[in-house]
Amino acid sequence: MENLKKLELLEGLLDLDRFQHLEFLLYRRISGTYKNNKTHSSSILELRVDVDGRRPQRILSGDLFRRFTIDLGFWHNFNLDAAIAPASHFSPFTIVLYQRSFIVETVDISTSNEVTTLSGAIRYYDDPAVNDETIVVEIPRVRFFQPAPECSAKIYKAGILKSAYCLPKISEYFRSVHLEIDRYEGTSFPEDVDMGLDPSPDDLPAGTIDTARVFRNAGIDLTVQEDDVLNDPDSPDVGNNWSEAELHQLMEDNFDRFGNYLQWNVYGVIVPRFGDPNYNAGYYGTMFDWGGWQAGDTFLRQGFAIAEDATRARSSGSLYNNDAKRDRLVLQTFCHELGHAFNLPHAWQRSVDDNPASNSFMNYPWRYTDGGESGFWEDFRWEFDDSELVWMRHGNRRDVIFGGNDWIGNNLSIFTGPMPEVQEGPLALQIDGNEFVRPFEPVILQVKLTNTSAQNQIALDRLQPEDQLLQIYIEQPDGSHRRYMPPVKRLLAPGDVVNLAPGESIYDSVNLTYSTAGPTFSEPGEYRIRAYYGNEEAAVMSGSLRLRVSSHYSLEEEKLTHFLRRVDVAKFLYYRGGGPKYDGVVQELEEICGKYEKNQPEIVQQLQLALGVHYARDFKTVKVIGKKRLISVVKAEPKKAIKALSGALGSAKGKATTLDALTFAKASGLLLDVCEKLGDWKTAELTAEKAIRQLQDHESTKAHFNSFKKRLTQIRKKTKK
């Protein structure tokens, strides 16, 4: 009777009329996490069993740890005064260090005498050449309401027992994660969503779903902490638009569990809009965490954000025509970005099993190839697909855990070697840039996409790696290959569609100087760079660009290189600005510009550009006052912005610039904006005149050239008044 009372708690999940007489047939599932963590165990195994329950993948995986005992008793040999070093200071203590992870991809399953035996060959992620180790796991089968039993796990090498474990079951899930969410005043935490909203699959169960349930359904025990509401006491408008630099600093300052180490804690933030500095209506989500390559730096994938106003503003027929449907898109977008924090790529960007027709969170509804945006929602089951489940549940710990590696997939040599054949297609991709740089100089890539056909062609004007349509692959001087991974990843709507006439091109300028792994070109030698527009399976590829990084430079240049690779300086230059915590960096950069202006104009003008963008915009930070977290705004400094931007442009008096044409055009436009706000029409006129002279022969900046001509006419009207 006691068990039947417990069974009644499952009403709605089980047919009680059918099962109350068959309760003795119900066995507890064996999938979940098992771990030995007793103090006497020197070797610790965290074992994940995934063979039954919800969407089983028939896989075993594990993480191995080692417990070390440290005894500081040797300090007694120094006869220290007891007052300085009392005996209690010499008590031994232990530390636990992670060692490696493994996976068993083919599992043999058998059950006898109510014990299930699981066995298979082990593959270590960090050493796949090891092929002679196997594991045997035995798990007693117990009734549904009985406590979960311990399992035994034995690892064999070449058939000889190597290690044995007795593992208590610690969770029904495969990972345990804590998500902390902050939101800006006026936005909302993701709402519970009715899964039956039209359109949706006909066979979905009735009820609602939220962020925690999405990930628990995927086997991840997600705890959601809806934490702080960020207030703006200064203005009803200032906090609406957030740059990536502001988001990153918000994470560092406001994430309660922020730390420079691997952890199963992650930070999400909801703001109205993204923009740097102008609002981008098609920019819905971002994973903005900067990568770490030096001690003390932020580790990867600890923070993400969504822009609620922008997401809710999406329009597509009747798909988002009421609040409930807009809530659905917000939740899907939020879970998509959290998926990126787990290191999940887009469904169509995987190096293995890529699938643009996946009805997973990691697809874009508007990129769904099996029925378009409406078809996506008709098929969407609020699930990750099997490849993604395997990754989150069983991927290499360092690849999945927040603060860990940035995954780049399989062998990349095919993406940087010679073109396999001449491409036939309507679009051509070209890249260009300096072929010789010194270690402290920035590496700027000019990208051009051209319609080479005789008919008009539709293309997306997304030529920045952060937007994840353009991908860059680099062959290193030692022959190894890597994919360039920008510190920021953006989730963008399918806007910016351009209709290219025959022979027409779109252009952009890409700064490759810094990646998630640090300086992209940190070693002297020859590199080869190639770009892809699309994905690895179906992409327009560019030719290969040779780049040589000089190995001959002076001590003074080496000092400059060391400074520019410092973590705080690198962050400031990538984001082109920062809050008050970067005041020291700003001062150092100003001094560097003054010192090297004549001898190193190439780098100085890039530094002046970053300083100019920094001075030109307001910057939001969060201050804790009492129990409230209030937004504080550091106002722009337009006069300093004009000075820095003028220097970056070679000054408005005719001095030469070293900036590429596109970067020059964008910087000139920003300088004009600042001058107009300040009412400095004389500098504005000189800037527009120089921009017209500089850009008149550049096809890539034709639109900018025409814009400057119009603006110059308007400025001259102002100066005559």
State where each predicted segment sits.
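Contiguous segments within soluble domain cores/interaction surfaces
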Residues: 452-516, 524-530, 600-609
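Propeptide-to-catalytic entry region of secreted or membrane-anchored zinc metalloproteases
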Residues: 50, 68, 86-292, 310-334, ...
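The catalytic-center signature of Zn2+-dependent metalloproteases
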Residues: 311-398
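Short beta-strand elements
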Residues: 166-178, 537-568
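N-terminal prosegments of processed precursors
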Residues: 2-142
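Low-complexity, acidic Ser/Thr/Pro/Gly-rich terminal tails and inter-domain linkers that flank the onset
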Residues: 414-439
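Flexible helix-coil transition and linker loops at the boundaries of alpha-helical arrays
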Residues: 589-606, 643-661, 694-702
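Compositionally biased low-complexity segments at domain edges in trafficked proteins
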Residues: 552-602
